[in-house]
Amino acid sequence: AAVLEARGPRPAPVEARPESVDRREMDWGTLEKVVFSTRPEFRVPAYVLLPKGLRGRAPAIVDLHSHGGMFLFGKEKIINFGANHPAMIEYHKANYAGRPTATELVRRGYVVITIDAFPFGERRLMMDEDIAAGWERAKYSIEDVRRLNRKCRSKESALVKSLTYAGLTWPGITFWDDVRTVDYLLTRPEVDASR
């Protein structure tokens, strides 16, 4: 109980209200982008990966991306899209032996969900450079990605302080997002909740 209390207040329960915003076939199966609620104030972007040829239900896993100082991308860190951003290709080689985990798990028959943890990917701190680029990460060079990641890292302490003043904690936000992600995953018709 003390560990949960240290993470800050328990957020009010919310309906996930999932919305599918994109779905495409990949060589390893189906990639669906969804957004769903984890708190009254948060809509969380996620990818759900479904194994190729899935019939019936399959075991499922929540695959959490790393921190690694890479703020510009979140859930993309653990998926092979086939045509990845050059910064992600570099990241996959350095951190995942070129084999992102979500893609490897879906190839082994798991339904996989991965979210953008706060404050990564689509949930990261917005910088002036993001606004100028129209927030399209595909337009960034590898050096742009490195520069923006350095800038985000330099703002981490201010972010933590701001959350604390608001009565929240970064680990608490992450924890409850992860709990609500499991809750949402178990509602998916492709998931065998017993496995």
Predicted regions and their residues:
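Alpha/beta-hydrolase fold nucleophile elbow
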Residues: 190-195
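N-terminal cap/lid segment of alpha/beta-hydrolase-fold proteins
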Residues: 8-60
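Cap/lid segment of the alpha/beta-hydrolase catalytic domain
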Residues: 56, 64-176, 184-187
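Mature N-terminal segment immediately following signal peptide/propeptide cleavage
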Residues: 1-9
